[in-house]
Amino acid sequence: MEPDLGGSAAQPPESDPPAAAALVFGDRLDVARRYYDALATAGVERGLIGPREVPRLWDRHILNCAVVAELMPESATVVDVGSGAGLPGIPLAIARPDLRITLVEPLLRRTAFLSEFIDAAGLDITVVRGRAEHSGVIKEAGGADVVTSRAVAPLAKLAQWSLPLLRDHGRMLALKGASVAEELDRDAETLERLGAGKFEVLECGVGIVATPTVVFSAELLPRGERPSRHREKKPRRQAGAPGGRGGVAGKVRRRGKSER
């Protein structure tokens, strides 16, 4: 029997999944629909999702996260920090059952919701209660291929939480908004000091969802591949000059269907 996530008889509001959901989730669309139902009922009742977000759960939350699956290597180990109601980790697990996903979340009411839904839906996801920067969490969940996060902190802070959980050459993927270029300009030196490099700003879900998901990507460089801090500083590039720190130069790379 499926557990009662909300502890009440509340029924989810009617909302048929958009056509894009069938493209993203395929034969696992029913599982995605169950996740929508859980967010719209228990998620609201427990304060994990604001009531005003319910009408846009599919587009702004579930699909917004799921399309990031196109960046994931096959059978990758993925750690989702500050997972909250399971975004983006649960949509990724539904869209890509080959991924080995761990959700890291410090609050008990959230981890309880996550564990109950995961058990009810039969998903192969690990839930770790704790803060991403704590040594116990790093010991349990570290060495990941990918660490994801969504709208939880500025890039510099996300890097402090995410990079210690990665293997060398693993990728930090932060789901961000339109201000990511400004954040990168402000925080790039801090990211480099922490060992990050190969910065990119990507768009996922192009041609699938109405508003593509903006993702900041950085790679954890092994110590021997990191730029020396003692090298002579290069002159700052003038505004509008090509290139730039990490090769981003304020440009966004759009990923179409042919790239997946």
From Swiss-Prot:
SUPFAM superfamilies reported for this sequence: S-adenosyl-L-methionine-dependent methyltransferases
Enzyme class, broadest EC rank: transferase
Superkingdom of the source species: Bacteria
rRNA processing is among the record's keywords: yes
Entry EC no(s): 2.1.1.-
The keyword Transcription belongs to this UniProt entry's keyword annotation: no
Cited function: Specifically methylates the N7 position of guanine in position 518 of 16S rRNA.
Protein name (database record): Ribosomal RNA small subunit methyltransferase G
Species of the source: Nocardia farcinica (strain IFM 10152)
Gene: rsmG
